[in-house]
Design a protein with these regions (language model features):
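Phosphate/anion-contacting hairpin/loop surfaces
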Residues: 1-2, 6-145
Length: 145
């Protein structure tokens, strides 16, 4: 969840940015300031791992968690580059998230607005350049072949 200022809400509304809603919130010790919860309503289809580039594969041994009966089986995970989704699944909103969750994605229009009006405390990264890990998969799973 993200809290945004009234200034940013007005900027997005004045520019008819789609795929988001705003709900007033109160931040303790800052009741005099107007902040809003940013809710993302835009969607795209699930993320397509097959189109991302594997940068590195890291193998790990079977591990027993100390003082427990938990055993993490031997396996590996991949460090990936690029985030892809079926373009036809995108509802064309300016703010959107994949149906299986994940980071907020914005259009070039939103990126340009945020930069032009010097909105702070925001990190923007091209989805083609995103680095992420595929998760840890035990040796005997299809995702680890």
């Amino acid at each position: 969840m993200f809290a945004i200022s009234e200034r940013v809400v007005k900027l997005l509304q004045d520019n008819k940015i789609t795929g988001c809603k705003f709900y007033p919130i109160t931040i303790n010790d800052h009741e005099d300031l107007s902040y809003y919860l940013l809710a993302i309503t835009g969607r795209c289809g699930a993320f397509d791992i097959s189109k991302s580039k594997v940068i590195e594969t890291i193998e790990y041994p079977e591990t027993v968690i100390q003082n427990s009966n938990i055993v993490i089986p031997k396996g590996k995970f991949s460090v990936m580059k690029g985030f892809h989704f079926p373009l036809a699944s995108w509802d064309r909103s300016d703010f959107f998230i994949p149906e299986d969750g994940g980071d907020i994605i914005v259009t070039e229009c939103v990126k340009d607005l945020l930069k032009k009006y010097k909105v702070t405390n925001v990190v923007l990264e091209n989805i083609k350049d995103m680095i992420w890990n595929s998760g840890i998969y035990p040796e005997n799973t299809a995702l680890n072949s």
